[in-house]
Design a protein with these regions (language model features):
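Acidic (Asp/Glu-rich) sequence patches and key acidic residues
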Residues: 1-234
């Protein structure tokens, strides 16, 4: 199964403000605080309820569950209720690190990101669908962009991973994070574009906050592949 990968600009402080603190409110039965926070950010009622539902799922997470598959994934979903996020098909830092572990230097493990202690084990990377990947801290975002500009080896490695014209989408996400002084969180299946029926594309977050560049690129590629397959089957 392929991966729908998304990149979410978010700072550790925002993780605390939008997820970890509201998570405690939900555990204490104070869901009105969550809805008040959503209202402060101008969130529509439909998405405010989705936001609350994600936090309720987070509050039900058990200690043995992987952080990446639970809180990490929910963090990415929550970010998309507040800010723009970015999509690429099948390309991820987690996969690049599997091939070339040296690139882990651009990432920070969850134990160095979360403001609170969690008993959940963490893999610090994509392990399957519906999962958080790595987190690039704000300073690491800046460093990667600098190295991308001046180091041909870094650019070559990233072009191979984000092939098919996808690298500009990643760069757009990195640049947005740098300009906003945020880090960048990777996740899978937060958004799932439907190449056959684009209007039936799904997102666990706010679909309209997904930057369209990567989605259009995937849809165009998928339709070309479908047309080619149909032509070859004649």
């Amino acid at each position: 199964m392929g991966f729908d990968v998304s990149f979410h600009p978010i700072s550790p402080a925002e993780m605390d403000m939008w997820y970890f603190t509201p998570l405690e409110w939900v555990r204490q039965g104070q869901k009105d605080k969550v809805l008040d926070l959503a209202e402060q950010y101008g969130m529509e009622a439909f998405y405010a309820q989705k936001y609350l539902s994600v936090l309720q799922a987070g509050a039900a997470v058990e200690e043995q569950e992987l952080f990446d598959k639970s809180h990490g994934f929910y963090l990415a979903v929550v970010q998309g209720f507040f800010l723009t996020y970015y999509y690429t098909r099948g390309s991820a830092f987690s996969f690049l690190i599997e091939e070339k572990p040296v690139y882990r230097r651009y990432t920070t493990p969850w134990c160095g990101v979360t403001p609170r202690a969690f008993p959940n084990p963490a893999k610090n990377g994509i392990v399957e669908n519906y999962c958080a990947g790595v987190y690039l801290a704000p300073a690491q975002v800046v460093q990667l962009l600098e190295d991308l500009e001046r180091d041909p080896k870094v650019r070559s490695d990233l072009e191979r991973q984000w092939c098919g014209g996808q690298l500009p989408v990643l760069v757009k996400a990195l640049q947005a994070a740098r300009e906003q002084e945020r880090g960048l969180l990777e996740a899978t299946e937060v958004v799932e574009p439907n190449p056959i029926s684009p209007n039936e594309s799904r997102s666990y977050s706010n679909l309209f906050h997904c930057d369209k560049d990567g989605v259009y690129l995937f849809l165009d590629t998928a339709l070309k592949q479908l047309a080619q397959a149909m032509e070859e089957s004649k």
